[in-house]
Amino acid sequence: MGQTLSEPVVEKTSEKGEDDRLIYGVSAMQGWRISMEDAHTAELNLPPPDNDTKTHPDRLSFFGVFDGHGGDKVALFAGENIHNIVFKQESFKSGDYAQGLKDGFLATDRAILNDPKYEEEVSGCTACVTLIAGNKLYVANAGDSRSVLGIKGRAKPLSNDHKPQLETEKNRITAAGGFVDFGRVNGNLALSRAIGDFEFKKSAELSPENQIVTAFPDVEVHELTEEDEFLVIACDGIWDCQSSQAVVEFVRRGIAAKQDLDKICENMMDNCLASNSETGGVGCDNMTMVIIGFLHGKTKEEWYDEIAKRVANGDGPCAPPEYAEFRGPGVHHNYEDSDSGYDVDADSGGKFSLAGSRGRIIFLGDGTEVLTGSDDTEMFDNADEDKDLASQVPKSSGKTDAKEETEAKPAPEAESSKPADGSEKKQDEKTPEESKKD
């Protein structure tokens, strides 16, 4: 079981912004964990590389979520620097944004590896980002954070969760000399792509893309239409608890109620937060969530009105009205979400609440979103986790699942996180050797 506090840290760090193209909100919460290891970036309007407006005629926006494990150092570095590093890539400067994102992820990895300040660093992080250029979204992902597009209330994931048991990931891992055991890379790391985690990137004979764990991202390009309402980027602290479709419907209800996007993020995190930390699993993780709304030439008020009108007319699925209520941390809603229409929820039967079905929800590379059968008491137990993976995943997918966990390993000392009043939370009586990092 991972280390948890006697009470969750429910204070949230939130921000919002807008221009004539986009509106966004973001929020982050430490929750039950003893420290905050998530980071994020939200850049509404970035100048083009070298101020070259001929090659880059569209305004550029960049948003990302970085879920750390083993410490916060790599996640913080990525959140503060990855967009600048991406913009410096020659491929990006030439206008090839997809390749620029791929090159930028690997360059971020190299920058950390080559910085003497991080010489002994053992932590890593996911990276799920979106670049918005004109009417195109470029989503780059390494790890199991996720981007999901809301299309008139229907969820369309724009990233795949990189889990070691996926066939393509397992093939790379084994070809590089690693193995997958209990759903983990070398029996340790339960995601197969990440920035950092350099202990899995030591083969001098292999390219960065072919290491046991790689920072090389998948990139999805999507051309926006009037039906595309918003994009959600979040860490697995959200996706462990809710299906992609459930999140989209929740966000849509908040928009219909004219709530600010950062407040919708806060409400979602409160809804995901576990009522207690006895299990230390689902609902006990750090949580970070970004919502980006696409105005399509409308004002912010017109955008809100348009979505509210669609909801009132039954134009696409939406959560019930009570989901716009702010009930406070750990007070859960419960209802069956809708079929997204994008073949991501057929096997999950995803519930909107921790009070409903329990277990880890993952989006697999074959387009299937799976709700595992595990009770969250197993999520932080290395001995028991994934012992019945074959029964948890539909046979047609041929894939399995594991909650992202790493074996306990020493990490550089980081500043401790405290609540706003400066008081410290009492930790459960667990030693680091008895705990695993998320």
Swiss-Prot record:
Residues 375-387 have a biased composition (Acidic residues). Gene3D superfamilies: PPM-type phosphatase domain. Residues 398-438 have a biased composition (Basic and acidic residues). It is an enzyme of class 3 (hydrolase). Pfam families: PP2C (PF00481). It is found in: Cytoplasm; Nucleus. It comes from the Eukaryota. InterPro entries: PP2C, PP2C_BS, PPM-type-like_dom_sf, PPM-type_phosphatase-like_dom. Binds 2 magnesium or manganese ions per subunit. Mn(2+) 1 binds at residues 67-68. SUPFAM superfamilies: PP2C-like (SSF81606). Mn(2+) 2 binds at residues 67, 236, 285. Its cofactor is Mg(2+); Mn(2+). CDD domains: PP2Cc. GO terms for cellular component: cytoplasm; nucleus. PANTHER family: AT28366P-RELATED, PROTEIN PHOSPHATASE 2C. This is Protein phosphatase 2C homolog 2. It comes from Hypocrea jecorina (strain QM6a) (Trichoderma reesei). The gene is PTC2.
